[in-house]
């Protein structure tokens, strides 16, 4: 890790800040809240922002970043911005248009990282979640290798500096890596990862291929109704995190964040509270002992908060495999 900017280098030579701010909001939250939170995060020291077309917040996030550039707080080159192509735009001919729509909303010339959001195609169209008359998602089939070639073209066109994937299992990653004529490897795989789902095998696989693991849901998310079983155990109530928080004089959230950073994982965190956003920057101020890291490893129970259950039955549903 480059400690000056708290960055790691990607396999294409670009750098990614190891702590990012996620801009997905719970349904009950007005999307305009993303603008306020992004400004708070920039003022707190965040330079890495993770978004996606399906979040419907890119116009607000872009406005916040542009206002902070205009007032001299940051420069565009100080910001690392990630967007993602949604499942309805995975046909190769739709990928660039999706990225261009995001750029239009952001009023940016480029994004720093563009990801395939899920390896599962849905019927193309205006609806993000197209359903049939029975309310079932309308699945589609697409050659993900062809989708990847369209991603490579976006990089060549200068619309994104780096390209990667999200929610891919190791077999789906291998399919891209083994693609004949591969021009660019995915720089990262963004997946759910926290002490209850530590992704040890996927992390080892990604490291062996020089692919960075980016973690979302690092504090165990309870907020996304419809996506998360609200009866799931609350990660931050885990007694081990509580006792370590006392030992290091930090919060359980900071222990969970620090755990991932020390494993070489890039961490995304979202908070709706200003004091929490600022507090999360303290993750660089302390270090967990190797003994405590082993204890945290022992919390794994392969438990997903976000199993993308609405996609179950899709031929490319990634979570059937062990990793």
From Swiss-Prot:
Means of activity regulation: Inhibited by high concentrations of substrate.
The keyword Cytoplasm is annotated on this UniProt entry: yes
Site (Lowers pKa of active site Tyr) residue list: 84
Pfam family, one: Aldo_ket_red
GO molecular function: 17-beta-hydroxysteroid dehydrogenase (NADP+) activity; 5-alpha-androstane-3-beta,17-beta-diol dehydrogenase (NADP+) activity; aldo-keto reductase (NADPH) activity; androsterone dehydrogenase [NAD(P)+] activity; lithocholic acid binding; NADP+ binding; NADPH binding; steroid binding
InterPro entries, per database record: AKR, AKR1C, Aldo/ket_reductase_CS, NADP_OxRdtase_dom, NADP_OxRdtase_dom_sf
Catalytic activity: androsterone + NADP(+) = 5alpha-androstan-3,17-dione + NADPH + H(+); androsterone + NAD(+) = 5alpha-androstan-3,17-dione + NADH + H(+)
Chain residues that bind NADP(+): 20-24, 50, 166-167, 190, 216-224, 270-280
pH dependence: Optimum pH is 10.0.
Residues at which substrate binds: 31, 117
CDD domains in alphabetical order: AKR_AKR1C1-35
Main location: cytoplasm
Residue positions of the active site: 55 (proton donor)
Organism superkingdom: Eukaryota
Subcellular localization: Cytoplasm
GO CC annotation: cytoplasm
Function summary: NADP-dependent 17-alpha-hydroxysteroid dehydrogenase that converts 5-alpha-androstane-3,17-dione into androsterone. Has lower 3-alpha-hydroxysteroid dehydrogenase activity. Has broad substrate specificity and acts on various 17-alpha-hydroxysteroids, 17-ketosteroids, 3-alpha hydroxysteroids and 3-ketosteroids. Reduction of keto groups is strictly stereoselective. Reduction of 17-ketosteroids yields only 17-alpha-hydroxysteroids. Likewise, reduction of 3-ketosteroids yields only 3-alpha-hydroxysteroids.
Protein name: Aldo-keto reductase family 1 member C21
Species classification: Eukaryota, Metazoa, Chordata, Craniata, Vertebrata
Gene name linked to the record: Akr1c21
């Amino acid at each position: 890790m480059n400690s000056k900017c708290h960055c790691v280098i990607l396999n294409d030579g670009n750098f990614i800040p190891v702590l990012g701010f996620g801009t997905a909001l719970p349904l009950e939250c007005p999307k305009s809240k993303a603008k306020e939170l992004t400004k708070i995060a920039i003022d707190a020291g965040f330079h890495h922002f993770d978004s996606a077309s399906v979040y419907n917040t890119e116009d607000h996030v872009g406005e916040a970043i542009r206002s902070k550039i205009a007032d001299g707080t940051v420069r565009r080159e100080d910001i690392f911005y990630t967007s993602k192509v949604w499942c309805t735009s995975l046909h190769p001919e739709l990928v660039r248009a999706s990225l261009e729509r995001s750029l239009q909303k952001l009023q940016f010339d480029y994004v720093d990282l563009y990801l395939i959001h899920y390896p599962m195609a849905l019927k193309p169209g205006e609806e993000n979640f197209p359903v049939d008359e029975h309310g079932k998602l309308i699945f589609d089939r697409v050659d993900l290798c062809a989708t990847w070639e369209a991603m490579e073209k976006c990089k060549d066109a200068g619309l994104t500096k780096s390209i990667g994937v999200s929610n891919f299992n190791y077999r789906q990653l291998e399919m891209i890596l083994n693609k004949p004529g591969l021009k660019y490897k995915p720089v990262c795989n963004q997946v759910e990862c926290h002490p209850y789902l530590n992704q040890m095998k996927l992390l080892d696989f990604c490291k062996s291929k020089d692919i960075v693991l980016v973690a979302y849901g690092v504090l165990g998310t309870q907020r996304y109704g419809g996506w998360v079983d609200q009866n799931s155990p609350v990660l931050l109530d885990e007694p081990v995190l509580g006792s370590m928080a006392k030992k290091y004089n930090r919060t359980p959230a900071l222990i969970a964040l620090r755990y991932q950073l020390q494993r070489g994982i890039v961490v995304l965190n979202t908070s709706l509270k200003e004091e929490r956003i600022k507090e999360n920057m303290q993750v660089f101020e302390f270090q967990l002992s190797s003994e405590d890291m082993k204890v945290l490893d022992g919390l794994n129970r392969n438990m997903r908060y976000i199993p993308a259950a609405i996609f179950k039955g899709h031929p490319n549903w990634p979570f059937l495999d062990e990793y």
